[in-house]
Amino acid sequence: RLIGHKDTGAKIEVFLLKQNSKMQDEHENWEVLIKPSKRVKPDTIIKISDELSVRAIKRLEENGEWLVELIFNGNNVLDVLHRNGNIPLPPYIERKIPNEDLKKLDFERYQTVYAKDEGSVAAPTAGLHFTKEILKKLENKGVELAYVTLNVGLGTFRPVQCENVENHKMHSETFEISEKAAEQINRAKAEGKKIVAVGTTTVRTLETAYKKFGCIKACHDHSELFIYPPYEFKVIDNLITNFHLPKSTLLMLVSALAGKDFIFDAYKEAIENKYRFFSYGDCMYIC
């Protein structure tokens, strides 16, 4: 998340979504979300710092998505973005006053201990509950861990606004499954072992791969799979997930797995007992 200003002094927020083209002479094209979008027109320049500016190219969607050009000093755009940007926290976590201590804390905590590759617009938050110590204890108890790469997309934040859920358009999210992970998961299924997904994006990744190949295969692909009742799961048996926003696709996914009435009863109990919801909140184990 980048905060900058137009030459008029107007404050503009630029939320990076995905890289659209490779760097050429300190320039890159990205798809972004701009707020407030109405203040921006094609060729508007948004200055982030002395080493980074953003030029609007064209509007992609009415919800504020734009194609922009990043203009920066140096040859490593990620270094520039890390110096000038902030962790892309969900909109319900407010950081009204710039605070370097909070920025450092969010950078450390708003990503999993096993995170490696750049690419997500948000953390796969179910994984935030795991420490290296917990993962080691699970392995010592005979739990086999398989890792997939998830590029969590903007759709994570978007509510369903259609009267008919079948008309909702899911945003695409990219993922990667390694040969090792594919072998682990297929072997576990063949042996009748339970597959426990950590997070809803993991669910969509594995179910998408199975739908495409009939099993889990190593691949670098994307998912537009919208899971809602009465979806029949092919890969996952259990799920570790946080408590989700109302009207979200994630709430529909967990309802497909556990049943709407069961999930709503669980949420009612969570509210009565003051559980923490959303990204930095508590989680549930659905089995």
Language-model region placement:
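Surface-exposed, charge/polar-rich loops and edge strands
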Residues: R1-C287
